Amino acid sequence: MIKLQKLKLYGFNNLTKSLSFCIYDICYANTNDSRNSYISYIDEQYNAIRLTKILKKTCSIIGANVLNIFHQDYEPQGASVTILVCEEPMSMEKIDALNKNIVSSSVLAHLDKSHICVHTYPESHPQSGICTFRADIEVSTCGIISPLNALNYLIHQLESDIVTIEYRVRGFTRDIHGIKHFIDHKINSIQNFMSDDIKSMYDMVDVNVYQENIFHTRMLLREFNLKNYLFNINLENLEKEERSYIMKLLSKEMREIYYGRNISR
């Protein structure tokens, strides 16, 4: 991350930095049984235990200390994981709810600001045969910890067809002279922090609001191999016309999600 000239702050760095992902995995399944199997498969692939491991690794990468972990698998499908984090290591006495109801103020300062969470949403539609899996991830920190340090790791771990990313810096912090600072590092695009291999894999477009410190990037996987999008279907068993139909169906679905609107054809 490119930092601005080093500042001497008055007190704690109160800037809140939030990195939000919305990732999509798309496939085609031509029977009800196949669609149900896909939902079960993807639900297991992204179960709460695996997601917890990914988020704990994320904490390690950004240098955050774990305060508390909550994870849950839902019926019939879906999972959630939430991890509360802080900048400095905490002794158990400071975060123990049974410690005469005395909780360190530094812990309270982080409970509403510094967290990492993920929620999953598998779904399908019987008429089209399209199945989608969506996961929402948010890494929100305050202090010197930057969620952008985990950007490449999370993209690689989730291996998605479509990704929308938003990075926001909120609030302000003061230096020792009382001057407010609304951001503490240079950025003009989330793409600045992506590795070259990720940039080569995706087509990307930015929608940024610089004056509000809001940065938005949409990503669409460049390589389209129909075989990778068929669930319980052998590509060799499909007629040319059927292959063409499925490719158009998948392409339309992916473009609609990428652009965030319905496309008539």
Curated annotation (Swiss-Prot):
Function text: Catalyzes the decarboxylation of S-adenosylmethionine to S-adenosylmethioninamine (dcAdoMet), the propylamine donor required for the synthesis of the polyamines spermine and spermidine from the diamine putrescine.
GO terms for biological process, alphabetical: spermidine biosynthetic process
Annotated organism of origin: Buchnera aphidicola subsp. Acyrthosiphon pisum (strain Tuc7)
Site positions for Cleavage (non-hydrolytic): 113-114
Catalytic activity: S-adenosyl-L-methionine + H(+) = S-adenosyl 3-(methylsulfanyl)propylamine + CO2
Pathway(s) served: Amine and polyamine biosynthesis; S-adenosylmethioninamine biosynthesis; S-adenosylmethioninamine from S-adenosyl-L-methionine: step 1/1
Cofactor: pyruvate
Assigned GO CC terms: cytosol
HAMAP family xrefs: AdoMetDC_2
Active site: 114 (schiff-base intermediate with substrate), 119 (proton acceptor), 142 (proton donor)
Name listed for the protein in its UniProt record: S-adenosylmethionine decarboxylase proenzyme
Residues the record lists as Pyruvic acid (Ser) modifications: 114
Family: Belongs to the prokaryotic AdoMetDC family. Type 2 subfamily.
Top-level EC class as recorded in UniProt: lyase
Keywords assigned: Autocatalytic cleavage, Decarboxylase, Lyase, Polyamine biosynthesis, Pyruvate, S-adenosyl-L-methionine, Schiff base, Spermidine biosynthesis, Zymogen
PTM summary: Is synthesized initially as an inactive proenzyme. Formation of the active enzyme involves a self-maturation process in which the active site pyruvoyl group is generated from an internal serine residue via an autocatalytic post-translational modification. Two non-identical subunits are generated from the proenzyme in this reaction, and the pyruvate is formed at the N-terminus of the alpha chain, which is derived from the carboxyl end of the proenzyme.
InterPro entries: AdoMetDC_fam_prok, S-AdoMet_deCO2ase_bac, S-AdoMet_deCO2ase_core
EC number: 4.1.1.50
Top-level taxon in the UniProt lineage: Bacteria
Free-text comment on the cofactor: Binds 1 pyruvoyl group covalently per subunit.
NCBIfam families per the UniProt record, alphabetical: SAM_DCase_Eco
One GO MF term: adenosylmethionine decarboxylase activity
Subunit record text: Heterooctamer of four alpha and four beta chains arranged as a tetramer of alpha/beta heterodimers.
